[in-house]
Amino acid sequence: MNRLFILLLTTFVVSTIVAQPGYTPSKENLEARTKFQDMKFGMFIHWGASSVLAQGEWVMNNRNIRVDEYKNLIRVFNPIDFDAKEWVATAKNAGMQYITFITRHHDGFSNFDTKQSDWKITNTPYAKDALKQLADECHKQGIKLFCYYSLLDWYRTDYQYETGKTGKGTGRKAKSDWNSYIAFMKAQLTELLTNYGDIAGIWFDGHWDQLDNDQDKTLQAKVNWHYDEIYSLIHRLQPKCLISNNHHLLPIPGEDFQAFEKDLPGINTTGFGGADISKLPLETCETMNDAWGYNVTDRKYKTVKQLIQYLVNAAGRNANFLLNVGPKPNGVIQKEFTDTLAAVGKWMQQNASTIRGTRGDIVPAQDWGVITKNTSSMFVHILNKKDNNPYLFIPQFTGKVNTAVLFNGKTPVKFKQQPEGLFIYLDGIKLNDIDTIIQLN
């Protein structure tokens, strides 16, 4: 009986997620959260050895490629056209203020000169540290750098792949060693936070690999991820570094913003976004086509209109928008992406002040659009007015409006405040196909 009790107790301890104990965000961390919310728009970059196969970042798992075969990519990944300056400028010209870069994805390949593994970019024919170049350029151009870091691993044998849901076909036979894997992650995170200057945040992904099913809404996993130790390590090395975990659940103590994948907060079309919305800063990420990593056959490109409206809808729900690109294996961001980003950038040049530095959830999102607010004005974003009424009705509106004008042109707009809400009259106004913005002062 005693042996059974000890076994059950051990199982409970291993499967329980422990948050960072007694976590109180530092003053610098709280300030970083506010600045993060102000930025509103960032670039996600999925890129690495998997890009060579041009079938997306999950190709190792999806095609059941064994480690002894997949490791040959290190001989051919040679991104000779990679230009960190161009990548950062592309993001900046699109109106983005931060970049989240894949330092290590689920295939375990490190895009930096880690001392913890030989499976890294500096052992390819390219032989250079991509993260170092990107970090230096971000710091030079005033763009914040976040590091995506995979919790799961399809390549290493010390990762507890026996209980994981993915990576079953990669040919691993050796018994896993969880303590070794946790030590490996801590060592790599220490490298990221000590060798590359200011890191604005760490973006974790892969917790869900150790859950029984995708509908599991608890933090109980088959392994102990040691989040208490990992989060404490990060906040000790860089106190203002923000932590997010794409576990599709409510954040736990130690996490500084809540991530949503391919869905706006409160909307769950993909099955990833069922978590309740926390009081922390929010971020939603989305792709420019279907794939995250480079996929040569994926031509399902989203339009400029779709992406601008996604950005506006995110801001109206008080969330940042992290828009992904998957560069080619040679290091070039494909023209379809750069052309679209340039067009988004032109829109941002005119309208960024209605997005950047604002907050949302002033009133719930409406069928016709959303509202954002800064310290002096509210911005009514009319994205999709379907009815023929000559007015726009904003329910639950309590602020006192002095004037209303079209944001572009400052033409006065008629309005009337009633107990039930605000009426804005649209007679004589030609609605823009993407976003008609009315500024309320």
Language-model features: where?
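Bacterial Sec-dependent N-terminal signal peptides
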Residues: 1-21
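Mature catalytic domains of secreted/periplasmic carbohydrate-active enzymes
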Residues: 20-441
